[in-house]
A protein has these predicted regions:
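Acidic, glycine-centered active-site loop in nucleotide-sugar glycosyltransferases
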Residues: 279-288, 292, 300
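Nucleotide-sugar donor-binding catalytic core of glycosyltransferases
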Residues: 2-56, 63-73, 78, 86-94, ...
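Short, amphipathic alpha-helical "lid/cap" segments that border enzyme active or binding sites
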Residues: 68, 72, 294, 298, ...
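A charged, aromatic-enriched C-terminal amphipathic alpha-helix characteristic of glycosyltransferases
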Residues: 306-339
């Protein structure tokens, strides 16, 4: 019998750019009754206390059990058909056992790699095997999940949100003059990303960096542009000479949220060469430009910056067609989840 999910409870971050927010808007677009519990409540405490719990208790949120109790209470009041937990969210093993006993179906969309040292948390790994199903956007997790004792899991990639990821309303001549000569990167200064950008700067590549913590690196601070709002990000992506699409290697990602988001917005993408990206974008120069490592990237950047506008437009049109025409919205991901759960 096909399960028709009409009531969805999301456990996630409702702030803009986060997966929890994207799933919330996707469920609303499908006409579902949906609520979201903000995981940030589990971490609200003085900085010293957060650090104490983080370092001495294995990345444990200060209010793990209290937040978990709020999940149980909300489920009993809202009575969702499905509970969707996003990533390494503060839902304890104890809470999952209670929810299962009460008959609630709880799944996890594993936004981060729990075997990445930066995210490793024993309390979460204890809970992970108790989910009814785990969806992961990285193939590298599949064998880990088997070894960990997770019985039911599926690969499900990231997506884009049509409400947020679309071409800018207008790209002005000032935008082009400001950004067309730059290689743009939008995202935080993770160590892997810093290493790549540092090599570009050493090679004399003109870069523009938007996101957190870039100013913390003295040799990159001059290229840091701070944070940009959603519309400005769309204009940057559409106007930049090229946009870097990097995976998080420490996370063993084959693609990232940006892989879908930037493609939906449109622009010239320099994409890390992975199997996931090849499956999404096709061969080199069909819709994106691939690079294999930092040395290869410098050469590909010169290729991208030297392209005629007509060439860039062909790549962009092909890229947007592959992503937008391929059922890659977060609403489509929700529908795919239901098909898998009903199989």
């Amino acid at each position: 019998m096909e399960l028709q999910i009409m009531r969805l409870l999301i456990i996630g971050n409702p702030r803009p750019t986060h997966v929890g927010q994207h799933f919330l808007r996707a469920a609303q677009s499908l006409g579902w009754s949906v609520e979201i519990l903000d995981v940030n409540a589990a971490y609200e405490a003085p900085l010293w206390l957060r650090r104490f719990f983080w370092h001495l208790f294995g990345h444990r949120p200060v209010h793990l059990e209290a937040f978990s109790d709020s999940v149980i209470t909300t489920c009993r009041e809202f009575k969702p058909d499905l509970v969707l937990v996003t990533g390494i969210a503060p839902v304890s093993a104890r809470a999952l056992r209670k929810l299962k006993k009460d008959g609630f179906r709880v799944v996890n969309f594993l936004t981060d790699d729990p075997w990445n040292r930066q995210h490793h948390a024993l309390w979460f790994l204890k809970a992970l095997k108790l989910y009814d199903h785990v969806f992961t956007p990285r193939h590298a997790n599949e064998l880990d999940l088997v070894r960990h004792g997770v019985v039911s899991f599926s690969y499900l990639p990231f997506a884009y949100s049509p409400e947020d990821h679309y071409p800018p309303e207008a790209v002005t001549e000032a935008d082009r003059q400001r950004w067309s000569g730059l290689v743009a990167f939008i995202g935080g200064a993770d160590p892997d990303r810093v290493a790549v950008v540092r090599e570009l700067v050493k090679a004399g590549v003109p870069v523009g960096l938007w996101g957190g913590y870039w100013r913390d690196h003295a040799d990159l601070a001059a290229f840091a542009q701070g944070h940009a709002d959603a519309e400005t990000c769309r204009r940057i992506i559409a106007s930049a000479g090229a946009n870097l699409c990097l995976v998080r290697r420490a996370n063993r990602d084959g693609h990232s949220m940006r892989s879908y988001e930037m493609a939906a917005i449109g622009g010239c993408l320099l994409v890390e060469d992975t199997a996931d990206h090849q499956n999404l974008f096709g061969p080199d120069l069909e819709s994106v430009i691939y690079f294999k490592d930092s040395a290869d990237l410098a050469a590909k950047i010169h290729r991208a910056l030297g392209m005629r506008e007509s060439e860039r437009q062909i790549l962009q049109n092909n890229m947007r067609h592959k992503v937008i025409g391929g059922g890659n919205t977060y609403a489509a991901r929700l529908e795919k989840m239901l098909l898998i759960l009903d199989a």
